[in-house]
């Protein structure tokens, strides 16, 4: 999906004596033109021809992410001016009731619906909003972006001992902040959880609900969560690490001004969207903000990846329980539960050879991947060991924890050991 821009710069004019009278006469006319027309390097955007494609950006921001909302919507407005499809936004923020609106190619808002206070972290709310967006803005194709906090596949009540003593703290207090699917501090009359758990999300969404789902949240590049979502979209996009949330530094989730134009095409466009995402962060002037990971996953290949992983790990749960995780590529920082390790690195460490089938399937599954060498100066990422996906190691010391039970009782991926 391409877009056009027209750029005006300075014109170097050569005057000759015979043309002086003309230019003097024209000068008075030129001075009447708006000053903006004489600015250097002014960009006039020529919008692409519209296509029948809607992307819903679902912003569960009734939490500390409220501070990032204005920046994100501004970015979406900029991106819409270069986009062929239609961006629809649902936003639930602190101190306001939720609303649904579309963004025009001129960057304006068109109100679609207003809501009473509700729990945007309830997956049934998400499913309803998707249905309403499709009804109010009908189109041939549909994409979905989930925007909020996240702890990956972990359930809301994960045990505190997953974060070692001495490293615990509120990540929001530090710099840069990150987006720890969807927390809602004011759920209205909804008595359901204020956290959207991945198995409940998968149950609530119909199969083939979108062509792609982009998780603009932390830690959702985990194989456990993506496998649960394998039937919901053709492609899944996520980060195995945290995602920055520093709007003041132009470093907050997806840079929609650059990425949105690519979210209305096919897989090649999605790959270009990921390239733009990575390039945005990799070019940051501050090293601490040069922090991003991204993976584009072909959901149709996830079943094959389950089989290939099971072929090498079946019956090896005991080996996993005793695994020395200190040698693995990790994707968690100090304040994040220490359970996010590189999937490929785990398999290669445990199996020690005989991984050709697994490696080939992993390459088919992860269409595109990229990672900066460092993440917020706390985490080194080896390009050699970066597979694009994280995976849980069910260590014996986690037995008895609620997330250990949740993993084996609720997540289908745990079947790789059976």
Regions found by a protein language model. Give the residues of each.
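Sec-dependent bacterial lipoprotein signal peptides
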Residues: 1-36
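Bacterial Sec-dependent N-terminal signal peptides
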Residues: 17, 22, 32-54, 395
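Terminal, contiguous helix-loop blocks that mediate binding/assembly
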Residues: 48, 169-418
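Structural recognition of the beta-strand scaffold that forms the well-ordered cores
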Residues: 54-59, 86-91, 143-146, 211-215, ...
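Gly/Ser/Thr-rich loops at beta-strand to alpha-helix junctions
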Residues: 62-65, 148-154, 218-222
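Short, solvent-exposed loop/turn and secondary-structure capping segments
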Residues: 68-69, 99-101, 154-159, 225-226, ...
């Amino acid at each position: 999906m391409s877009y056009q821009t027209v750029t005006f710069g300075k014109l170097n004019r050569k005057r000759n004596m015979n043309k002086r009278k003309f230019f003097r006469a024209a000068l008075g006319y030129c001075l009447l033109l708006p000053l903006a027309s004489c600015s250097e390097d002014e960009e006039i955007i020529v919008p692409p021809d519209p296509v029948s494609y809607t992307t819903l950006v679902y912003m569960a921001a009734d939490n500390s992410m409220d501070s990032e909302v204005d920046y994100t919507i501004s970015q979406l407005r900029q991106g819409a001016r270069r986009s062929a499809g239609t961006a629809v936004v649902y936003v639930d923020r602190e101190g306001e009731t939720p609303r649904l609106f579309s963004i025009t190619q001129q960057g304006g808002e068109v109100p679609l619906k207003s809501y009473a206070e509700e729990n945007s972290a309830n997956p049934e709310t998400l499913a309803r909003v998707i249905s309403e967006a499709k009804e109010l803005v009908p189109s041939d194709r549909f994409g979905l972006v989930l925007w909020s906090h996240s702890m990956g596949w972990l359930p809301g009540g994960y045990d505190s001992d997953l974060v070692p003593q001495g490293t615990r703290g509120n990540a929001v207090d530090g710099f840069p902040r990150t987006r720890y699917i969807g927390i809602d501090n004011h759920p209205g009359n909804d008595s359901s959880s204020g956290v959207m758990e991945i198995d409940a999300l998968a149950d609530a969404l119909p199969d083939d609900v979108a062509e792609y789902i982009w998780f603009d949240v932390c830690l959702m590049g985990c194989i456990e969560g993506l496998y649960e979502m394998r039937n919901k979209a053709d492609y899944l996009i996520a980060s195995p690490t945290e995602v920055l949330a520093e709007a003041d530094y132009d470093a907050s989730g997806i840079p929609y001004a650059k990425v949105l134009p690519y979210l209305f095409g096919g897989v090649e466009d999605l790959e270009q969207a990921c390239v733009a995402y990575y390039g945005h962060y990799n070019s940051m002037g501050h090293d601490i903000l040069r922090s991003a990971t991204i993976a584009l996953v072909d959901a149709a290949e996830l079943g094959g990846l389950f089989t290939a992983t099971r072929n090498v790990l079946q019956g090896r749960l005991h080996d996993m329980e005793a695994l020395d995780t200190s040698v693995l590529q990790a994707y968690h920082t100090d304040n994040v539960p220490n359970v996010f390790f590189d999937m490929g690195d785990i398999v290669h460490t445990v199996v020690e050879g005989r991984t050709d089938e697994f490696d080939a399937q992993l390459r088919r599954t992860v269409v595109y991947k990229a990672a900066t060498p460092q993440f917020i100066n706390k985490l080194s990422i080896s390009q050699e060991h970066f597979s694009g996906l994280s995976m849980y190691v069910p260590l014996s010391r986690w037995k008895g924890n609620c997330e250990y039970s949740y993993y084996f009782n609720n997540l289908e991926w745990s079947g790789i050991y059976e």
